[in-house]
Each structure stands twice: as structure tokens, then as C-alpha cells.
Amino acid sequence: MKQQVTDPFQAIGDPSRRFMLRLLSKESLTINSLAQHFDMTRPAVSKHVKILYAAGFITIQDMGRERHCSLNQKGFHELQSWIDYFDQFWQTRLKRLDDLLNKKTKK
């Protein structure tokens, strides 16, 4: 399956896809096994799987007639970098505020 680049934030914007990632964090599953957890058609589940694959969150391995889905750690790097950036941003801001408040209380 050819992998297209998809915005990872858009990919995780759907609650069904986030739940699929949670399920796959426990074990690799076939698309049919994933579909059993949702009140949607198998083609709809396949569409969500394709989006997660295109965003790099999962890998798909064909084994006979079944397609096995697994999490792909590399797919989460962009999200982690974005979160780390803003985590550092807020830590710096809060440290400055803390320093300022401590200065004022010492006066």
C-alpha cells in the first residue's frame, strides 16, 4: 500500500480513529477485528484505517487474505515534537511568572 502524507492532527481529529489507535496500542488487529468494535460498516472502518496509515500512525501487513494493523512509533514523532515545543513554551512562561511573583513578595 502506497503511503500518502496526511496531517497527523487531522488524522487524530476523529474520535473513531483515536479509539482505533487505543485498541492497536494493546495489540495488532486485523481490519475485521477492528470493525467489531464499531457500529459502522467494514468499508467505513477501512477508510479510517487508510487515513491512519497515510498519517503514519499505523503499519499494515498483508498476511494471506487478512490485513494486520499495528502501531507505528515513527508516526507519533511529529505530534510529540509539537507537544514538546508547547510544553517548553509554557514551562518557560510559568517560570517567568513564578520568578516575578517571588520578586514582588520579597519586596
What do these predicted ranges mean?
Residues 18-20:
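Pre-recognition alpha-helix immediately N-terminal to the DNA-recognition helix
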Residues 14-15:
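Helix N-cap at the start of a conserved alpha-helix in ABC-type nucleotide-binding domains
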Residues 48:
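Residues within the DNA-recognition helix of helix-turn-helix
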Residues 1-6, 11, 22-37, 42, ...:
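C-terminal regulatory/oligomerization modules of transcriptional regulators
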Residues 62-68:
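Short, Lys/Arg-rich nucleic-acid/phosphate-binding segment
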